Each structure stands twice: as structure tokens, then as C-alpha cells.
Swiss-Prot record:
Tissues of expression: Expressed by the venom gland.
InterPro entries: Snake_toxin-like_sf
Keywords, ordered alphabetically: Blood coagulation cascade inhibiting toxin, Disulfide bond, Hemostasis impairing toxin, Ion channel impairing toxin, Neurotoxin, Potassium channel impairing toxin, Secreted, Toxin, Voltage-gated potassium channel impairing toxin
Gene Ontology CC: extracellular region
UniProt organism field: Naja kaouthia
Disulfide bond in keyword set: yes
Family label: Belongs to the three-finger toxin family. Ancestral subfamily. Orphan group II sub-subfamily.
Protein name: Neurotoxin Nk-3FTx
Keyword Cell wall biogenesis/degradation annotated: no
Amino acid sequence: LTCLNCPEMFCGKFQICRNGEKICFKKLHQRRP
């Protein structure tokens, strides 16, 4: 199945697909330069 982008206001910009389900989670650490 296809995973759609998660709303930024709901969960950060990170998302993963498991068993065809969409799971969102916030970013815990910032990107390193």
C-alpha cells in the first residue's frame, strides 16, 4: 500500500510504513550540519 504524507501539525516530518499502515512520529533530534 502507499503511504501518504503526515500532517506537520499532527506528527513531524518523519513517517514510516508498517503492514500497510501509516505511522507518524515527531523528530527527536535535529539534523547535524
